[in-house]
């Protein structure tokens, strides 16, 4: 098992992989609860009954879901080091253009925009990503995986 860290490049069986994990939670419109708050249990069950869209800090949501400034900088350094070329790019969410092809109403954010810059500049064979709960191939090179396992090498 290999833990592919954000903003790193890996050589696996002669293939280069660039990785950049992370994604914004889109089911937190009603807030993020503090599990240590005095009224946590009451608020939690109220929000469940009301079918609110929320998460619980450090249980179902972490601020580290998105890359830090240091991780973005490290990713750019890595891409420079490998000449902006990889056989495979592996991310959790997709670049802006692909997000909008999936669903024009999906929200773009700092990470999807960062990935869009990579999409425009990098040379790659395939881009594999998840997050959007579907299995699809978009524009021949972008592979959205959800319930599928695919062999790539």
What are these regions (language model features)?
Residues 8-9, 80:
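Short secondary-structure boundary/capping segments
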Residues 15-105:
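Active-site-proximal loop/helix segment associated with metal-binding centers of metalloenzymes
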Residues 10, 24-25, 133:
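Short, flexible micro-motifs
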Residues 94-153:
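Conserved beta-sheet core of the metallophosphoesterase superfamily
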